[in-house]
Amino acid sequence: MAKKSMIAKAQRPPKFKVRKYNRCKICGRPRAYLRDFGMCRICFRKLAHQGEIPGVKKASW
């Protein structure tokens, strides 16, 4: 239940701008957040493998 309440709290506008913290837009995970995509590493990896993120492909060198 705490996770659901924290997700709801993160969606509200904060009283002060500096209090805003990043959460994944898909699952609500607070850690391993990628700013460029607005999601956590797990959701990013899943969507990248499915080809749903334009311009992202698996690196090989």
From Swiss-Prot:
GO cellular component: cytoplasm; small ribosomal subunit
Cofactor note: Binds 1 zinc ion per subunit.
Known cofactor(s): Zn(2+)
InterPro entries (alphabetical): Ribosomal_uS14 (IPR001209), Ribosomal_uS14_bact (IPR023053), Ribosomal_uS14_CS (IPR018271), Ribosomal_uS14_sf (IPR043140)
S-S pairs: none
Listed GO biological process terms: translation
GO molecular function, one term: zinc ion binding
Chain residues that bind Zn(2+): 24, 27, 40, 43
Family matches, as Pfam families: Ribosomal_S14
Entry-linked HAMAP family: Ribosomal_uS14_2_B
Family of the protein in this entry: Belongs to the universal ribosomal protein uS14 family. Zinc-binding uS14 subfamily.
Subunit (UniProt): Part of the 30S ribosomal subunit. Contacts proteins S3 and S10.
Role of this protein: Binds 16S rRNA, required for the assembly of 30S particles and may also be responsible for determining the conformation of the 16S rRNA at the A site.
Protein name, per record: Small ribosomal subunit protein uS14
Species name: Carboxydothermus hydrogenoformans (strain ATCC BAA-161 / DSM 6008 / Z-2901)
Gene coding for it: rpsZ
